[in-house]
């Protein structure tokens, strides 16, 4: 059979008309430029915001800018081998990280890859890093405490499970120290901790991990690290990855605590990415959605109801509420809390712990300014005994700070004012605390009880801390039953109050401090 040329051309035409275009063509694009980890891609007509893109060499990126004729994406990891003309494919997937108990005790990067040299993580599940926060209907009010073991926080700015409490202050004021003490104090308290290090020196992160290992805290802690040497994309994603790991426990009726150290550096990383993507800059050159950057992260910290947990686990876990407590850290410049990012995060969170350089340099550590530090919801979660005893402390300190300012100009003070100043000096001294030495509830209760009932008033200021330490040792050896009752009931009954008074008086008489 012979075909003439016209028949051949007709055959080809009919084949072309009947050809179904492959979907792959729509899902492939070409790299048109690579600069500072930002890639412009032409030809990706079927791509979602936040979708993972596959580059040559098993490298992945994240689609962030969807424009009319191109897509702006950020590369996750090394990008030296990517060049103009490379083929990019869509994956149809959103970025996910491994989750589950297998991560506990490990140090991972922002994508959940282990970086501690202890082998693979072997997590059975993965979950999306961007998730919608639980709705109002699924939330419960905060009612259980997170004991940080830090006297001034547990007494004056208590934190509850499911709360967001900001730690804010200049550099070198002890922000990380407060966060680490909170983690160390969770030993045996059935609370999983996640520490997210963003933009810190690798040596600083190593010191944190070493300290957590020394104190046995790595047994219930996950460390997510995006150091200063990592790309801006990794620093931007690390908090979301850590939050997803924490949500795994929250949604299964457990309690978790996450620390973001610090969100200022995440905002810087996001600003860098946005400017490279040519997004219009706003105040302080941040993009317009920098508030949403932090609000969508911190809204995921919540106390969820028993119904939510039961629904999420398909009835496997019943009668248990879960919580994710967030302690975001923000670094200020020269104490300026009116800057863009600090004001944003203050408005999102349920209170703030303000650390001051002047107090830190004066030797008052932790350097917490009691006047401007607040906890908007934690009061409901405070243990009974601490709530009963801490009211007077805050008042004493506030009055002391006010009077101390006037006392500088007054030559002769009346007896009541002088007494108030003396009490304030002793309370300030009492609230000093060495790092890595968090206190149990009974220890805090005894310290507050001593201050409230005037047992410190006749001591020299330098004797306050030795007296407190000696009293604790004395109670441990001679009144173990009293300690146990306070620790178990988290309350101070009339009988126990009388016993504690007698114990303190006998210790004072002994002078063993």
Curated annotation (Swiss-Prot):
One of its GO terms (cellular component) is proton-transporting ATP synthase complex. It is a peripheral membrane protein. This is ATP synthase subunit alpha. Produces ATP from ADP in the presence of a proton gradient across the membrane. The alpha chain is a regulatory subunit. It is an enzyme of class 7 (translocase). Pfam families: ATP-synt_ab (PF00006), ATP-synt_ab_C (PF00306), ATP-synt_ab_N (PF02874). Signal peptide: none annotated. GO terms for molecular function: ADP binding; ATP binding; proton-transporting ATP synthase activity, rotational mechanism. The record marks 373 as: Required for activity. NCBIfam families: atpA, PRK13343.1. It catalyses: ATP + H2O + 4 H(+)(in) = ADP + phosphate + 5 H(+)(out). Belongs to the ATPase alpha/beta chains family. Keywords: ATP synthesis, ATP-binding, Cell inner membrane, Cell membrane, CF(1), Hydrogen ion transport, Ion transport, Membrane, Nucleotide-binding, Translocase, Transport. ATP binds at residues 169-176. It is found in: Cell inner membrane. F-type ATPases have 2 components, CF(1) - the catalytic core - and CF(0) - the membrane proton channel. CF(1) has five subunits: alpha(3), beta(3), gamma(1), delta(1), epsilon(1). CF(0) has three main subunits: a(1), b(2) and c(9-12). The alpha and beta chains form an alternating ring which encloses part of the gamma chain. CF(1) is attached to CF(0) by a central stalk formed by the gamma and epsilon chains, while a peripheral stalk is formed by the delta and b chains. Its EC number is 7.1.2.2.
């Amino acid at each position: 059979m012979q075909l003439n040329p016209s028949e051949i051309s007709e055959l080809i035409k009919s084949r072309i008309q009947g050809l179904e275009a492959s979907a792959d063509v729509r899902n492939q694009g070409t790299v048109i430029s690579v600069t500072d980890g930002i890639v412009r891609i032409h030809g990706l007509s079927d791509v979602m915001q936040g979708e993972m893109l596959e580059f040559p060499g098993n490298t992945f990126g994240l689609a962030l800018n969807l424009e009319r004729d191109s897509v702006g994406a950020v590369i996750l990891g090394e990008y030296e081998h990517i060049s103009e003309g490379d083929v990019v494919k869509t994956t149809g997937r959103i970025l996910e990280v491994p989750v589950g108990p297998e991560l506990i005790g490990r140090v991972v990067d922002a994508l959940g890859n282990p970086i501690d040299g202890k082998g693979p993580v072997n997590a059975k599940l993965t979950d999306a890093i961007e998730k919608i926060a639980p709705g109002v209907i699924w939330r419960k009010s905060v009612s259980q405490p997170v004991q940080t073991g830090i006297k001034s926080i547990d007494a004056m700015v208590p934190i509850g499970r499911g709360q967001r409490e900001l730690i804010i202050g200049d550099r070198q004021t002890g922000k990380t120290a407060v966060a680490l003490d909170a983690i160390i104090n969770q030993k045996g308290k059935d609370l999983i901790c996640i520490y997210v290090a963003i933009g810190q020196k690798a040596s600083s992160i190593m010191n944190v991990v070493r300290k957590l290992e020394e104190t046995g805290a790595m047994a219930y802690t996950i460390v997510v690290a995006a150091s200063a040497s990592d790309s801006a994309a990794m620093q931007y994603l690390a908090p979301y990855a850590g939050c997803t790991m924490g949500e795994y426990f929250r949604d299964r009726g457990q309690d978790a605590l996450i620390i973001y150290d610090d969100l200022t550096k995440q905002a810087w990383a996001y600003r860098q990415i946005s400017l490279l993507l040519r997004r219009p800059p706003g105040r302080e050159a941040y993009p317009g959605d920098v508030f949403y950057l932090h609000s969508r992260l911190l809204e995921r910290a919540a106390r969820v109801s028993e119904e939510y947990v039961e629904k999420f686990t398909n009835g496997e876990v019943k009668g248990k509420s879960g919580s994710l407590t967030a302690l975001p850290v923000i670094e200020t410049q020269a104490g300026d809390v009116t800057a863009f990012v600090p004001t944003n995060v203050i408005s999102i969170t349920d209170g703030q712990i303000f650390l001051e350089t002047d107090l830190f340099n004066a030797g008052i550590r932790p350097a917490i300014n009691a006047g401007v530090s607040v906890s908007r919801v934690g009061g409901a979660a405070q243990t009974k005994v601490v709530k009963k005893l801490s009211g007077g402390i805050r008042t004493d300190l506030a009055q002391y700070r006010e009077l101390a300012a006037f006392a500088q100009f007054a030559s002769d003070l009346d007896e009541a004012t002088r007494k108030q100043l003396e009490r304030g000096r002793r309370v300030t001294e009492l609230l000093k605390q060495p790092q890595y030495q968090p206190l149990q509830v009974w220890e805090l209760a005894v310290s507050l009880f001593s201050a409230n009932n005037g047992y410190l008033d006749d001591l020299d200021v330098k004797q306050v801390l030795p007296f407190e330490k000696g009293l604790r040792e004395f109670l441990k050896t001679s009144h173990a039953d009293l300690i146990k009752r306070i620790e178990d009931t988290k309350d101070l009954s009339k009988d126990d109050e009388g016993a504690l008074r007698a114990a303190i008086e006998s210790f004072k008489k002994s002078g063993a401090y």
